[in-house]
Structure formats: structure tokens, C-alpha cells
């Protein structure tokens, strides 16, 4: 009976596909490590996201995706020290807990081993596939007073790694938090616009250099709001690069431009190129 209980406990704390720790196990371990670190060195958490994993699943199939996840797990085991905890947090997200680090510089060789291992060639069923990862790193107590802050700051570092070239590791710095908060505010504002406001094009005439006549218009994004202010493109600049918000904003603007052009033409007005 005791063996059965231990087996069930192991199953509850591990990821069935890779055999790594699962999210619950990892979070509990981080909480314990930060609470008991004392003067025994720094604690670090690494959050890893596989680049282009969805594309691999879509083009090579889920069998290839599962094989890649298992390979990543093995490569992480080979790159890390005995006692380091590796977890699969879900999907293509992995995490590593490092303890007893003498200083921040001790991270560098570990990160180099991880990236070297993960970026090595990988193939499935004779088909070469790219295996690269973006990594966000945060140190305790330097980057957070508790495990909640540590996870948040590692996640922010990961966000910047993914949005600045991918395939790299970034250590959290305070300025990353400021940048993340600004970008998050832009995305939140864009979501509000799509749900509650009516963005509309403002038209700027294009003038012919030959005769000074109007040959068309440029449609400029503007969004008047109830308080009388106007949301400008720079206020939501990050949203235009977002994979979901960018196309949604573009579609909303294109619909308005098409409606305006149709109305002008119905009145016999020459629109030109917009």
C-alpha cells in the first residue's frame, strides 16, 4: 500500500510525457528554496519557451512535437548539474530551478550549456527540425522578495527574450519591468478600443507635384474617446505588432476606409488611391 501511495504521489508531481517535474512540483520547490536559501547562495529560476513549436506541430505533426519535447527534456538533463530541478510547466514551456549559486556570473556557463544543447540539430522521421528556446532568468533575492515576484520577473525576462530575436537568454533587470508595463498598457488599451470604441480613419490628402491636385488620401488611425481625447497610433504602437490585435485593428480600419470610399463614390466624388 505504501508503495502504491508513493507511486501515486510521484505521478501527481511529474509530467507523463517527459518524466520531468510538473508545474505543481516546481512551484512548491521554488517556494521551499526561496524560504530556506539563507546564506547558502543565490536561487535562480529559468523559464524556457520553445521557439516555433506551434509551427512544428502544425507542419510535422503532433508526434514530432512530442518527440521534440522529450528530446528537450533529455538535453536539459544533460546540460544541468545534479540536483537541479527541471520541470515541464505545460505545452512547450519548461522551467529550471538552480540553487546554491555563488553569484550571478555562475549562471553564464549553465546558460551556455543549455543553449548549446537545445540548439543542436534535431530530426524526426528523417526530417530536420529546428530546436531553439527563449529563456527568461530571475535571481532570488536580487530580483524578487518571494517566489511570486521571482516568477513574474522571470516571465518578463522571457517576454523580452521572445520579442528581441528569440533563441536567447535574458536576465531580468528593473528596466525590463518598466518596458513590460508600458507595452502591457498599450495592449490593454488596444483591447479596450476593439471592445468599446470606434477607431476611425482620418484622411490626409496626397497632392500631385505636377499640378497641385488631390490624387488620393492617406488613411491615418485615430480613435476619439468619450472624454474628448484622441488615441493616437503611438499610444498603442505595440499592438500593431501583436499577432491577434494587429490584424484585428487593421481589419477594423480597412472596413471603415472601404465604407467611406463607397459613400464618396456614390456621391460622385473622385477618391483616388487611399
How would you label these PLM feature ranges?
Residues 15-18, 46-49, 91, 154, ...:
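Conserved metal-coordinating catalytic motifs of nucleotidyl cyclase and c-di-GMP turnover enzymes
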Residues 86, 113, 117, 123, ...:
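Cyclic nucleotide signaling catalytic output domains
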Residues 27-60, 87, 216:
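Active-site-proximal structural segments of metal-dependent nucleotidyl cyclase/transferase enzymes
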Residues 13, 31, 35, 73-104, ...:
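Conserved helix-loop-beta segment at the catalytic/binding core of cyclic-nucleotide signaling proteins
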Residues 8, 26, 30-33, 94, ...:
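Hydrophobic scaffolding residues in well-structured cytosolic catalytic/regulatory domains
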Residues 7-12, 16, 21-42, 73-81, ...:
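Short regulatory alpha-helical coupling segments
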Residues 9-28, 48-62, 67-70, 201:
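Conserved nucleotide-binding and Mg2+-coordinating catalytic segments in signaling enzymes
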Residues 29, 182-240, 263-266, 270-274:
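Active-site core of bacterial EAL-family cyclic-dinucleotide phosphodiesterase domains
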